[in-house]
């Protein structure tokens, strides 16, 4: 496992969830955080954290993200070829785009693509739009790229 300089990376919170457990004395809340980290130069990762407080969940998610960093192969400002990946009920289609197109992506895919340093890409999220599964599908798709 490589060590990364955390100052070089940006963090984006994709999702914060709250779960409630009803107990005799009232309600107990717990929080989950889904975070994406990237250096806008080919390195990107995601992490998932759970805790009783939001800041703790975010810290755990960021630590987890640095354990799951992948290197994305770029061809100029886009990706080398089309790729389609299924993760659970989510499917994501990534297509290279000509220069000047910009990032056409939504939901959980956009922060990953931007933090990976991709500037021109077309994406389509098919099936479930559950942000955790879309993030995982996007990371899986980017890891399958071959230069």
UniProtKB/Swiss-Prot annotation:
Keywords, alphabetical: Ribonucleoprotein, Ribosomal protein, RNA-binding, rRNA-binding
GO molecular function annotations of the record: rRNA binding; structural constituent of ribosome
Record carries keyword Glycoprotein: no
Cysteines engaged in disulfide bonds, as pairs: none
Keyword Mitochondrion among UniProt keywords: no
GO cellular component: small ribosomal subunit
Protein's GO biological process: translation
Domain of life: Bacteria
Any Pfam family matching the protein: Ribosomal_S5
Domain S5 DRBM: 9-72
Xref: NCBIfam families: rpsE_bact
Quaternary structure (record): Part of the 30S ribosomal subunit. Contacts proteins S4 and S8.
UniProt similarity note: Belongs to the universal ribosomal protein uS5 family.
Domain notes: The N-terminal domain interacts with the head of the 30S subunit; the C-terminal domain interacts with the body and contacts protein S4. The interaction surface between S4 and S5 is involved in control of translational fidelity.
Role played: With S4 and S12 plays an important role in translational accuracy.
Protein name per UniProt: Small ribosomal subunit protein uS5
Taxonomic classification: Bacteria, Pseudomonadati, Campylobacterota, Epsilonproteobacteria, Campylobacterales
């Amino acid at each position: 496992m490589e060590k990364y300089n955390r100052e070089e990376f940006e963090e984006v919170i994709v999702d914060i969830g709250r779960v409630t457990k009803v107990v005799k004395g009232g309600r107990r809340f717990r929080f989950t955080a889904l975070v994406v980290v990237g250096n806008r130069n080919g390195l990107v990762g995601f992490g998932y954290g759970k805790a009783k407080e939001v800041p703790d969940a975010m810290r755990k998610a960021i630590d987890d993200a640095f354990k799951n960093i992948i290197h994305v192969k770029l061809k100029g400002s886009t990706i080398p070829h089309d790729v389609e990946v299924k993760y659970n009920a989510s499917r994501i289609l990534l297509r290279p785009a000509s220069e000047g197109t910009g990032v056409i992506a939504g939901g959980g895919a956009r922060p990953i693509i931007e933090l990976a340093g991709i500037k021109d890409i077309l994406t389509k999220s098919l099936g479930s739009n559950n942000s955790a599964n879309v993030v995982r599908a996007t990371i899986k798709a980017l890891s399958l790229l071959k230069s």
